[in-house]
Every structure is written in structure tokens, then in C-alpha cells.
């Protein structure tokens, strides 16, 4: 009887590993075909503005802010694996940090402390010009990542153009990113 019970428990464990949930974006699981995911995203109020190869681009509202959303899928378009949110560019460091801190706080309240976080500012001054210069040089680092059920969520401040930056949020479904890498 103990052996039978052990086998049942082991089978349940194996099945639960295979039944891992997919990460979701705005309530839409990040899986399935590009066509189906894009249709669901459109139903959430996003407007498709273009696509190329295995990436579709949308404009819309993300938590009350205008954003551009990129959806990534396998080369054949059969499986979506990631969603990236791009907020408007800014030449103001304070705007970038406020947006970053706002979303970092939201994700920390929802998922707990980030699994990884690096916020490095080599400039000892709070000068917009110096901080934007450092961002352009790649010496300022603001990024945080959470390991969540089904994948990872990352937020960062990225260089955008000559003297601008933008806040970027990346949703990556663990199973589908791994499957895409194996191809």
C-alpha cells in the first residue's frame, strides 16, 4: 500500500510539473498562436500598428499610461513567448526614474521583492544632464526582475536615441522562451 501511495504521489508531482501555468499579460496567457494572442490583445483595447517577421506592435493603454507593446513569437508564429511594454521616450531623468519606481513598487507589492535588482548611478550628482549622459554611455543601470509563476517580469530604464531614455517592461513565458531557444 505504501508503495502504491508513493507511486501516486510521484505521478501527481510529475503531472504538476508538466501542468505549469503560462505567464499572463493583461489577463491573456502568453502562449498560443500569434494570431490568437493579437486578437485577444486587440479585444483589450490595443491597436495593432504593424508587424514584421515574428513581432507584432501595438499601441494602447497600460495601467493608465500610453504605451507601445511588442509581442514576440516563434519564427512560424505558432507560439507567443514574450511581451514587451515600451513607455514614451523622455529626456528627463526624473520622469524616467519616477516611472521606473512606480512600476517597481507595483510589481513588488504584487510579487514580493525582486529576485534581482541593480540600481547603479555612477554620477554623484542629481543633474539631469549628467544622468542622461551616463545613461547614453551605458554606465547607469536601473533594472529589477521577478521570477513569477510561469516566467519572469523585468523592468529597466534603457537608452533610446541620442539623449533620451525609456522605461521598458518585459514579460517572458518560461516554457515558451525555452521552447523557442531549442529550435
Predicted regions and their residues:
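Sec-dependent N-terminal signal peptides
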Residues: 4-15
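Non-cytosolic coordination micro-motifs
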Residues: 20-53, 88-183
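Accessory recognition modules or surfaces
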Residues: 24, 29-34, 53-76
Amino acid at each position: 500500500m505504501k508503495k502504491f501511495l508513493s507511486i501516486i504521489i510521484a505521478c501527481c508531482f510529475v503531472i504538476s510539473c508538466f501542468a505549469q501555468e503560462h505567464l499572463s499579460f493583461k489577463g491573456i496567457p502568453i502562449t498560443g498562436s500569434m494570431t490568437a494572442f493579437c486578437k485577444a490583445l486587440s479585444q483589450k483595447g490595443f491597436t495593432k500598428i504593424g508587424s514584421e517577421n515574428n513581432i507584432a506592435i501595438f499601441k494602447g493603454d497600460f495601467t493608465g499610461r500610453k504605451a507601445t507593446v511588442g509581442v514576440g513569437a516563434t519564427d512560424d508564429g505558432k507560439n507567443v513567448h514574450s511581451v514587451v511594454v515600451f513607455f514614451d521616450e523622455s529626456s528627463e531623468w526624473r520622469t524616467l526614474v519616477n516611472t521606473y519606481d512606480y512600476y517597481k513598487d507595483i510589481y513588488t507589492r504584487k510579487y514580493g521583492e525582486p529576485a534581482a535588482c541593480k540600481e547603479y548611478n555612477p554620477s554623484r550628482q542629481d543633474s539631469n544632464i549628467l544622468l542622461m549622459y551616463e545613461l547614453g554611455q551605458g554606465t547607469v543601470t536601473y533594472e529589477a526582475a521577478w521570477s513569477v509563476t510561469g516566467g519572469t517580469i523585468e523592468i529597466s530604464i534603457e537608452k533610446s536615441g541620442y539623449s533620451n531614455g525609456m522605461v521598458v517592461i518585459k514579460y517572458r513565458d518560461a516554457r515558451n522562451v525555452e521552447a523557442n531557444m531549442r529550435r
